[in-house]
UniProtKB/Swiss-Prot annotation:
Protein name per its UniProtKB record: Iron-sulfur cluster assembly scaffold protein IscU
Co-factor(s): Zn(2+)
Family: Belongs to the NifU family.
InterPro entries per the UniProt record, alphabetical: NIF_FeS_clus_asmbl_NifU_N
Amino acid sequence: MALSKLNHLYMAVVADHSKRPHHHGQLDGVEAVQLNNPTCGDVISLTVKFDEDKIEDIAFAGNGCTISTASSSMMTDAVIGKSKEEALALADIFSEMVQGQENPAQKELGEAELLAGVAKFPQRIKCSTLAWNALKEAIKRSANAQHLTDQNVKEGKNV
């Protein structure tokens, strides 16, 4: 009986994130990372505002299934205020978790840990990881842009 109530609570939290997602929308003045899941049609546009190494603000828009939208919402809650390195570590922990690998650090995912059950549904793994993959791409692009800026400064070019 207790397990049934716990599962119901988990499902309610996931449904709430899907129906009323946190950090939904687009941020002005930052490049959007757009990814899609051709298997089911989920599409995400992720915008991230960095303050040097920290994620200052983050938002997502797009169309997706319940799992994709809830995961996107939970991801934004988990990574805001984190360093790029911390956010990448969380993305890796999440990816491993939804593939069935247990990790004590899963607790750091916050409510996103509730999506561990996705591992039982392999066809939904891509739905759950779409936003996390977009986050990895945004961090990669940010690092590349910073490298180019640093290189131009080193070479004495105007940026």
